[in-house]
Regions:
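N-terminal beta-strand motif that seeds the catalytic metal site of vicinal oxygen chelate
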Residues: 1-21, 48, 59-61, 103-105
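Short secondary-structure boundary/capping segments
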Residues: 2, 32, 40-41, 53, ...
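Short glycine/proline-centered loop/turn elements that form peptide/ligand docking sites
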Residues: 19, 37-40
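Vicinal oxygen chelate
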Residues: 17, 55-105
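Short, isolated positions in well-ordered beta-strands
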Residues: 48-50, 94
Length: 105
C-alpha cells in the first residue's frame, strides 16, 4: 500500500457554512473552489481549507493520492472527487482523496 501522498486540505468544523465562507473570503482573501450546503473548499494562499458541517463531516486532514481505494471503499462526492476516511491509532481522522483530472483547487 505504498502511495505518494500530497497535502490536500485541513477540514474545520463550522456551524454555518455560508457565514464561515463569508468570513474567510472577507478576512483572509480566500477563494471559493467549491461550496454546497454541507461543506466548502477554500484556497487561502497555497493552502486549502475545507469548512464542514459537524453533522455531515468529521474534522480531518486530507492527503491527495492516486489510489485511495486501496485503503478502503471509495465514497464518491458531488464535486467529482472520491475518498476514503481512515483513523490513525489515536483516533484522528485522515481522508485520502482522489481528485478528477483538471481540478483547479
Amino acid at each position: 500500500m505504498k502511495n505518494t501522498l500530497q497535502f490536500h486540505h485541513a477540514a474545520l468544523r463550522v456551524d454555518k457554512i455560508d457565514t464561515a465562507v463569508e468570513w474567510y473570503v472577507a478576512t483572509l482573501g480566500a477563494v471559493v473552489c467549491y461550496q454546497d450546503d454541507t461543506w466548502a473548499l477554500l484556497e487561502v494562499g497555497k493552502i486549502s481549507i475545507a469548512l464542514v458541517s459537524p453533522n455531515q463531516h468529521p474534522a480531518h486532514i486530507a492527503f491527495a493520492c492516486e489510489n485511495a481505494g486501496e485503503y478502503g471503499t471509495l465514497a464518491y462526492h458531488r464535486d467529482g472527487s472520491a475518498s476514503v476516511y481512515i483513523e490513525d491509532p489515536f483516533g484522528n481522522t485522515i481522508e485520502l482523496v482522489e481528485t478528477p483530472p483538471g481540478t483547479e483547487c
